Amino acid sequence: MTRNYYIGLDVGTSVIKAAAFSEAGKLIKIVSEPAPKSKIVDRASQDMNEIWDITWNLLAQLVDKLDYGTPISIGVCGQGDGLWMLDQNGKPVTDAILWNDSFAQGSVDECGSTWAAR
């Protein structure tokens, strides 16, 4: 009897996780690693290349020595809003600016008060 499994991938703000689940929904294996921290003080950003590398390494760890069958699908979820800029070749332009970054808050406040004054 061939067994199949599903892969779940959660690329979160603080932790990246990969998990394998049976067709019945039972957790078979899970691996995780902390997401990289911002290298810029007072910013919420992440190196997209690091995110990519961690994600691929976790997927490799997940399937390594997983004698369970064949993966039949993969579900992916990630962080909410943010700015993840890529060039025309699909390569990162800069670090991802995360949903919880407040660098532009002063500009937003200024625009809001200017707009409200109209």
Where are the regions that the model predicts?
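Glycine-rich phosphate-binding loop plus the immediately following alpha-helix
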Residues: 100-118
